[in-house]
């Protein structure tokens, strides 16, 4: 008995007509034998979860670099929140949850250390530019390895959803599946709401600082705002689809306009605020110096990046190497390379009286 076929049949019988069915997938770059239990999107989800790039997200910054507590979001917890929000919206629209989950869990695996500070400086240092959504595709198709081959060989729908989850750059257009479009809106809902929460925890923001007219529309608490946005996305998208006017996931005009204003407020007040900018400057300094070091000493990188350098140029190989680092690993490398180290680490134990007392 092939369980996968039962699941695929259930999708055909139960999912919405506009959902992306596993049996309709455009396939993988390299054809594979189907899994007997899992659909193609289940396989993709599992490959992403078990990848090294996914595990490293737990040590990558969301907004605040090296926050002084255990409850601030990391890039991994952000990813999990996006996944939860997206699956709720997907369920409300009767979409393919397995595809949604694969895209959600993989959407940020190409993010740099130090959040968007790392992305910004690499974009300035590389002549061809750097975008984290495009880099997520590079990680999943070139850097990660499976069965001695480069890349995880994921389905086209998963890669497309990851590539188009961000509304910036040359790939700012929407994903071609509604499941992929769900990730874009879920990403925004997640980061704006949890960044407000973390900013309040850090003492950088009070709820009263947010314009009251935004809160009156979206909600005064974290859970209220999230519920408003998720519920509206489901209701408005269903309304548009039923009217056959639009097959695109979105928010109603009032909610969309208010949410845009709230995001703009967060950019001005927090993301581009003095505290975050000071840390961004330090983080960019570290990455720029590591980038210059590895351009001069490419042999210090693993053989995989030597192959990338031969095929696509040294700049791209160094960017791939650095973008995969965690925040802590970046800092430790910088210390090892640029900060003088004592030749006798236990000197104070050997000579406790240094003559200064």
Predicted regions and their residues:
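A generic, well-ordered mixed alpha/beta core segment in the N-terminal half of proteins
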Residues: 99, 103-146
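Histidine-centered, transition-metal-coordinating active-site segments
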Residues: 1-79, 83-89, 96-97, 130-357
């Amino acid at each position: 008995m092939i369980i996968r076929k039962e699941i695929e049949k259930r999708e055909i019988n139960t999912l919405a007509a506009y959902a992306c069915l596993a049996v309709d997938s455009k396939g993988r770059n390299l054809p594979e034998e189907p899994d007997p239990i899992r659909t193609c999107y289940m396989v993709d989800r599992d490959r992403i979860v078990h990848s090294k790039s996914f595990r490293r997200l737990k040590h990558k910054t969301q907004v605040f670099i090296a926050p002084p507590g255990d409850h601030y979001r990391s890039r991994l917890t952000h990813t999990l929140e996006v996944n939860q929000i997206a699956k709720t919206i997907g369920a409300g629209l009767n979409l393919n949850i397995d595809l949604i989950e694969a895209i959600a869990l993989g959407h940020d695996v190409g993010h740099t250390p130090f959040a968007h500070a790392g992305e910004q400086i690499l974009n300035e240092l590389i002549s061809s530019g750097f975008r984290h959504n495009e880099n997520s595709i590079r990680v999943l198709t070139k850097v990660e390895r499976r069965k001695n081959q480069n890349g995880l060989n994921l389905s086209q729908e998963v890669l497309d959803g990851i590539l188009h989850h961000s509304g910036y750059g040359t790939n700012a257009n929407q994903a071609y599946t509604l499941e992929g479009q769900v990730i874009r809106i879920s990403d925004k809902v997640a980061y704006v709401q949890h960044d407000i929460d973390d900013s309040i925890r850090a003492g950088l923001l009070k709820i009263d600082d947010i314009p009251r007219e935004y809160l009156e529309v979206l909600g005064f608490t974290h859970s209220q705002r999230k519920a408003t946005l998720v519920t509206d996305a489901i209701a408005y998208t269903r309304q548009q689809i039923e009217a056959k006017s639009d097959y695109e996931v979105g928010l109603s005009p009032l909610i969309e306009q208010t949410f845009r204003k709230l995001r703009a407020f967060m950019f001005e007040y927090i993301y581009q605020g003095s505290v975050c900018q000071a840390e961004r400057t330090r983080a960019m300094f570290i990455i720029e110096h590591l980038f210059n070091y590895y351009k001069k000493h490419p042999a210090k990188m693993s053989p995989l990046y030597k192959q990338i350098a031969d095929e696509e140029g040294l700049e791209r190989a160094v960017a791939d190497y650095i973008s995969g680092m965690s925040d802590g690993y970046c800092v430790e490398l910088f210390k090892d390379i640029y900060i003088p180290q004592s030749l006798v680490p236990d000197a104070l134990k050997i000579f406790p009286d240094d003559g200064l007392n």
